């Protein structure tokens, strides 16, 4: 509104100037010259005032925010992997929050718009203005938004629940998408992760937490798949894993790379995403053929993986370790019953152990009743040829393979694994 008013006033002054200095048969008199000078000075003053038009402003609810600094920071993630990442974004500017909770940034950033920025608040005593919290979307301390040249942004938020309470007055369509993404993230967090402890001690609890995390990540990736806006999609991908670990959602990341590199092939972030999602940088995907590696078997023989798969209807390639408590639990509670139920019908398990000690390996196999199925290990710990060939970093992991060695599904555990095997063996 202020910009429109400036334009109207400029137009009025311009017309008056034309009237003062318009050609005449007579010379311009002294009074006309003084009027011309006055109008010129007023014109310059107005231009200077309008050039200081606030582009980003807002109101912060400070109640209950005694632990927070009365400051707002503006941060730019210059690369894709800097989005939602602590200590990486470049601090562009800062603004004081007054006692009434108001703040404003007068000078727009000299950036090629549209560009993703992050508005950040910090606790008292925090010396890094670009520290971003990602533990709890209800209280996280930043919000990403898109700066569009010529458009002012007006923010409202509760400083102690910054991300959850963040709102924009009359948001643009692209920023409306980010607000919708925030709402979806909050819903997914409350449904799947809230109350879950990262230090969950029980073996079953660890597997359940992994399942919940996957469900949370999938909701964010589904948003990225459904939106037509590039920058909100990039935020969704980063919120799915701020630490950049996409091993368990590799197929979803690959699909996103395919989508956005077709639409924005020249955008630097699309290129970064393409590099991350290169198949050589991801674990083997559903639909890929498993590498035909020569495996040292428990009995001392070396056999190619494809040879072990031949003539089977369904094979579980299980990557485990004697020291992996969730793996051991799955041996006893899931794999033993499945093997007993379906082995005679063409169901096989090939277990590869990340072992350094043959004795510990053998003891675990016998104790779990896992000596029913096939076992292999290079006895090189987690630095071994199979992990390298599968491009894996995390266990427990499994791959369900058809008779050709093609991956049908990955990383199914507990009831999900039972249901897949039951359905597959009954249908074929």
Features from the language model and the residues they span:
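Short solvent-exposed coil/turn linkers within tandem alpha-helical repeat scaffolds
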Residues: 226-230, 262-270
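Structural microenvironment flanking redox-active thiols in thiol-disulfide oxidoreductases
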Residues: 328-368, 379-388
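Amphipathic alpha-helical repeat scaffolds of TPR domains
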Residues: 228-242
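A short beta-strand-turn-helix
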Residues: 294-315
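Bacterial Sec-dependent N-terminal signal peptides
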Residues: 1, 9, 13-17, 21-59, ...
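Thiol/disulfide oxidoreductase modules built on the thioredoxin-like
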Residues: 370, 378-423
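Conserved redox-active cysteine motifs that mediate thiol-disulfide chemistry
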Residues: 313, 319-334
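A non-transmembrane, solvent-exposed segment enriched in polar/low-complexity residues
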Residues: 51-208
């Amino acid at each position: 509104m202020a910009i429109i008013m400036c334009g109207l006033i400029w137009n009025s002054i311009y017309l008056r100037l034309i009237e003062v200095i318009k050609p005449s048969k007579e010379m311009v008199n002294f009074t006309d010259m003084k009027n011309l000078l006055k109008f010129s000075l007023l014109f310059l003053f107005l231009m200077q005032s309008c050039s200081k038009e606030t582009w980003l402003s807002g109101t912060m609810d400070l109640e209950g925010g005694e632990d927070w600094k009365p400051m707002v920071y503006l941060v730019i993630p210059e690369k894709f992997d800097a989005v939602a990442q602590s200590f990486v974004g470049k601090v562009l500017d800062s603004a004081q929050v007054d006692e009434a909770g108001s703040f404003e940034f007068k000078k727009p950033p000299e950036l090629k718009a549209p560009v993703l920025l992050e508005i950040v608040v910090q606790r008292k005593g925090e010396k890094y203005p670009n520290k971003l919290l990602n533990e709890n979307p209800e209280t996280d301390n930043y919000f990403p938004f898109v700066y569009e040249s010529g458009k002012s942004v007006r923010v409202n938020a509760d400083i102690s629940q910054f991300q959850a309470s963040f709102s924009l007055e009359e948001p643009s369509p692209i920023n409306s998408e980010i607000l919708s993404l925030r709402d979806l993230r909050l819903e997914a967090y409350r449904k799947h992760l809230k109350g879950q402890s990262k230090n969950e001690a029980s073996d079953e609890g660890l597997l359940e937490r992994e399942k919940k995390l996957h469900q949370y990540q999938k909701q964010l990736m589904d948003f990225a798949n459904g939106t037509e806006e590039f920058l909100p999609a990039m935020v969704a991908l980063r919120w799915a894993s701020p630490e950049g670990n996409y091993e368990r959602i590799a197929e979803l990341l690959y699909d996103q790379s395919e989508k956005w590199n077709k639409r924005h092939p020249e955008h630097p972030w699309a290129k970064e995403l393409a590099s991350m999602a290169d198949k050589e940088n991801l674990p083997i995907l559903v639909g890929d053929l498993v590498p035909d590696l020569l495996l040292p078997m428990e009995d001392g023989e070396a056999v190619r993986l494809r040879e072990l798969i031949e003539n089977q209807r369904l094979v579980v390639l299980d990557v485990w370790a004697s020291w992996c408590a969730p793996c051991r639990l799955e041996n006893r509670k899931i794999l033993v019953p499945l093997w007993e139920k379906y082995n005679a019908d063409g169901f096989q398990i090939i277990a590869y152990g990340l072992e350094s000690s043959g004795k510990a390996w053998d003891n675990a196999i016998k104790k779990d009743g896992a000596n029913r199925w096939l076992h292999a290990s290079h006895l090189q710990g987690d630095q071994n040829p199979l992990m390298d060939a599968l491009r894996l970093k995390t266990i427990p992991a499994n791959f369900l393979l058809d008779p050709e060695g093609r991956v049908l599904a990955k990383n199914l555990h507990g009831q999900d694994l039972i249901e897949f095997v039951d359905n597959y063996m009954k249908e074929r």
